[in-house]
């Protein structure tokens, strides 16, 4: 892990977020490229809503830098984001006005990559992956969601629920 003290902001109160960048390295025993799973608490939206580009945002530039420096393939996972946690954009208003947010997005990705590349506290783990799964029911109280289920847009099993405002609940799961 690495602490990233200077790259995030939370635009909603309360301002609470994790500054920890976590890296899991999968090292194949056949000599193929390592695969890094990076987990960091930030939405991938540094291009902002005013842009017209289709982009992978800063994770694209992070992945490129890591590929060049370590020849590792990267999967980025958005970490624990309870509010509106995004990356800090220096001179954001100027960059928006000058349509230069892409420059900032590249720099953000490269800087986060440098943090990932600096991680030196690796711990070897046994190659076992476990997961926990729990099913639960959610009241279908959203009329748009209920309609989408009723006409087949969303494939979901409905379960009768006398206490639900729509008369049914949906089964979902947390993994």
Annotate the PLM regions.
Residues 1-175:
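Non-catalytic substrate/cofactor recognition surfaces at enzyme active-site rims
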């Amino acid at each position: 892990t690495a602490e990233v003290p200077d790259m995030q902001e939370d635009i909603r109160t309360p301002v609470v977020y994790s500054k920890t960048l976590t890296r899991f390295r999968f090292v194949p025993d056949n000599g193929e490229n390592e695969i890094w799973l990076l987990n960091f608490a930030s939405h991938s939206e540094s291009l902002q809503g005013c842009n017209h580009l289709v982009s992978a945002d800063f994770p694209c530039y992070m992945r490129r830098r890591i590929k060049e420096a370590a020849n590792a393939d990267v999967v980025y996972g958005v970490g624990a984001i309870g509010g509106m946690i995004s990356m800090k954009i220096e001179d954001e208003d100027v960059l928006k006005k000058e349509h230069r947010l892409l420059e900032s997005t590249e720099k953000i990705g490269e800087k986060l990559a440098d943090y990932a590349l600096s991680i030196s506290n690796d711990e070897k783990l046994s190659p076992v992956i476990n997961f926990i799964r729990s099913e639960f029911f959610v009241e279908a109280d959203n009329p748009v969601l209920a309609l989408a289920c009723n006409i087949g847009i969303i494939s979901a099993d409905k379960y009768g629920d006398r206490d639900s405002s729509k008369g049914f609940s949906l089964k979902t799961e947390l993994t």
